[in-house]
Amino acid sequence: MNHLGMVLQIWEQHQFYANRKKCAFGQPQIAYLGHRHIISGEGVSADPAKLEAMVGWPEPKNTTELRGFLGLTGYYRRFVKNYGKIVRPLTELLKKNSLKWTEMAALAFKALKGAVTTLPVLALPDLKLPFVTRVGKWNWSCFITREQACCVSQPRVF
């Protein structure tokens, strides 16, 4: 609470005021970005209500429904390891004129729904510890990742 007092005092010095109706202090977790993320002491997690919507999504019957599903799941792609590989059969369907549902698309749809049921809690970075930057390439793509160089095995972001 001492830090909070210091912050509010500095705000007041610069004529910056907090709206009491919009403030919440001492909360174990808060909703962030329009209730799409939950931030707690453990890290950042997906909103359970959004996960229920993804799991309950029916098999798409047209490209509009498929785009809706991919839009919703795509928002959480940083939580899903190998998201691009999983959704590739589904994104391929968007390139054609009509939706021709295949067995591969059905498997990808089920795999993605399964992946969102077990989303990890992403750890918040510790800015006091160093980061490790890795650069690599795979097939036709390249990637750069930044990882926290510490003993915590909790993922930061995929």
Swiss-Prot record:
It comes from the Eukaryota. InterPro entries: DNA/RNA_pol_sf (IPR043502), Rev_trsase/Diguanyl_cyclase (IPR043128), Viral_Replic_Matur_Polypro (IPR051320). One of its GO terms (cellular component) is mitochondrion. Its main location: mitochondrion. Keywords: Mitochondrion. It is found in: Mitochondrion. SUPFAM superfamilies: DNA/RNA polymerases (SSF56672). The keyword Mitochondrion applies. PANTHER family: POL PROTEIN (PTHR33064), RIBONUCLEASE H (PTHR33064:SF37). A stretch of 270 kb of the mitochondrial genome is duplicated within the centromere of chromosome 2 resulting in the duplication of the gene. The expression of the duplicated gene (At2g07682) is not demonstrated. This is Uncharacterized mitochondrial protein AtMg00860.
